[in-house]
Amino acid sequence: MRQTVTRKYFAAASHQHDNECGAIIAARESRKHELRLQGWDRLRLEIATVQAGDVFSWVGASRFDESDLKVFAGRGPLGSGDFGAFLDTALDRGIIRFKREELAEGRPFLEYSYDIPLERSSYRYQTDHGWRLISFQGEFILDPEANDIVRLTVSTSELPENTPACRAISEVEYGRTKIHDRAILIPWEVRLRTIYRNSSETLNSTIYTSCREYASNSRMLLQAPKEPDASPGSNTQLTPSKSLPAGLRFYARILTPIDSDSAAAGDPVEGILRSPMRDKQNHVIAPAGAPLHGRLLLFERQIEADYFKIGVRLESVEVGGTEIPLAALTYPVRTRTRVDGNLFGLIVPPDDPSSGVATFLFRNQHLRLKQLDSEWITVARDAAASNDAQ
């Protein structure tokens, strides 16, 4: 299943002087307007639910990754548990109370509240000292005619003091989707609001699409396969297991359109070499026109500063039908330069050069990139791999 997460970042309340969580929560509950929106970003992942829990991958990746969720999350909050953990805990371990019956569009719905004390909780929240169990409570709504759950809310107790947040509140909307002639109940939209100790907030809105079920004989790849041993006597300069040497300059064109209405970090991008890639002896390693494969690893909008910020990582170049691993940054690495083309854009020094992610800024109300031209230089792949998915 694919999840698309839009994360909105709201400024701290200007009139909030008491930074105690109780006062912040009380002020929020009495407030009748949303805080000022500072910016947003968008992230897209593939998610699979296996026996051990949820696993994730970038869109189009050949295998799922057992890495911690924060590897994919970047700088913003990202939650998991939408596919059963919260609901199972609420129904199996919760102290449940019936609240009321309500009519909506002529149909009855039943509303319940529940409490999960700490000793029954499976809700984990990451702190400076590792993961901590958190008690939580909430409500759920049942459709008695369809025998389905319609909505689940999850509200944590006050979070530990060694975290920047006071509380996290999730709202999960459920619906049925058809898989192999069966209508399966799944969450189709989730909203996660995090309230921080400085009174700022974030709101994650997650939409789930492309749900499918793996057959019993499907093989879930959770780790990269071992590279095959080199054949005896082989002196091939470049193989799929060998990356390009550092220091090679080249011009590239990203051909995948990047549109602010739909693009997200995690999306694959395709491009071509605009110039040949040559080694120090001036031999052509990859010709002009060779396909490039990469990925958007950052897509964010800063509203007050009025710009879009995108991060692109080139991952491989295709030579003779073989994909060669590639790690590169825009050149020059530590200088701001103009983006080729009519749009006002800047190539800026990367936040972390070892991540292998090139950073671009565009000052536009809407971003409609049909292509993106820039100069690059290869870097040591080992350095980029150390922060491979950040």
Where are the language model's segments positioned?
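Contiguous beta-sheet cores, especially beta-hairpins with glycine/small-residue-rich turns
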Residues: 150-152, 175, 239-390
